[in-house]
Amino acid sequence: MKEADLITLRRQLHQIPELALQEKETHALLLKTIQGLPQTYLTIRTLPDLPTALLVKVQGRDPQRTIGYRTDIDALPVTEKTGLPFASKHSGIAHACGHDIHMTVALGILSYFAEHQPKDNLIFFFQPAEESKNGGKLAYDMGAFTGDWHIDEFYGLHDRPDLPAGTISTRLGTLFAGTTEINVDLIGKSGHAALPQNANDMIVAAASFISQIQTVVARNVGPTDSAVITFGLMRAGTIRNVIAGRAHLEGTLRGFTQQQIDFLQQRIRDIGQGIAASFNCQVKVALNQGGYYPVENNDKLTKDFIQVMKDDPDVTFVDTKPVMTGEDFGYLLNKIPGTMFWLGVNDPDSQLHAADFSPDEAALVPGVTAVVHFLEHRMLEKV
């Protein structure tokens, strides 16, 4: 695809953002685009139990392995405020995380290999439900990557607004944190504000729970390590002169290794049990990690990726640190070795998930060519 084709396609995708597992228009446009490519080497597959997902296999001429490339396809419940002439047509939904860029780069890579048969097999995975619903985990758990669709190594990108357009960046080890949703219900006894001895105040219990949770990172995580536990929602009480008999908390836990996350999850449960004993109340702690594991890059494959990027005179590569945001590609990289990397899209005054996020389309061609170059290099490596 030429740059003009990529831009046109990106703008079409940008106008039809859809939420997790609802990506019907997006799926249809992707399928139409892929069916318009040369079909000699392609096999297209849909998943009946995950109907907005799409897999495309490119048959290699002398395959020693199968390399996977993944892109996410869903959008966010955000009202777009970019002012672009090709802004979202769907009220209250926008590609505020740049998945339209991700899809366009993937289609550009696929179009190249549809015309230039690769040495190894390639499988492109157009994944629904990254922002929620664990789309990668859903596909893996239903056996999408078994048999003839087995993948030996997996790659994928995420756009990054604070890097110049076309810049590539990644690192050994963890790139994205793993995330866990925290839901806590505290159940005591309501009563008159003037008679606290006859009630069991869950606002006080909830405040104590939150305060104790804040000691977990400070005192259970080493000073050179990183983790975050944040509560962003608390509901309790109905009126000023009635003691709240119930409280509900919602928060998030984020860490850079699964071992650390498992430990912190247990500490949250332990504190919940302690609060229940201290305040003579019920504390129900629900932790949901789903498929949002840390994105941990494979050392061997990532070293190779970084070296290829650094050796490519057409690529600007920069080092990076891990980030506390989450990405469900972590689940797939927990099962299949691979590498995730950043693609700069030059929107430093905005950020991912912002209503005014507007990635620079100048990143499209460099993104496609850098990945094509890497994959062609990778296919020359012996298994």
UniProtKB/Swiss-Prot annotation:
Reaction catalysed by this enzyme: N-acetyl-(2S,6S)-2,6-diaminopimelate + H2O = (2S,6S)-2,6-diaminopimelate + acetate
Record family assignment: Belongs to the peptidase M20A family. N-acetyldiaminopimelate deacetylase subfamily.
Catalytic machinery residues: D72, E131 (proton acceptor)
Species the sequence originates in: Lacticaseibacillus casei (strain BL23) (Lactobacillus casei)
HAMAP family: DapEL
Enzyme Commission numbers on file: 3.5.1.47
Disulfide topology: none
Gene3D superfamilies in alphabetical order: 3.30.70.360, Zn peptidases (3.40.630.10)
Keywords: Amino-acid biosynthesis, Diaminopimelate biosynthesis, Hydrolase, Lysine biosynthesis
Keyword Hydrolase applies: yes
Phylogenetic lineage: Bacteria, Bacillati, Bacillota, Bacilli, Lactobacillales
One family name in Pfam for this protein: M20_dimer
Name of this chain's protein: N-acetyldiaminopimelate deacetylase
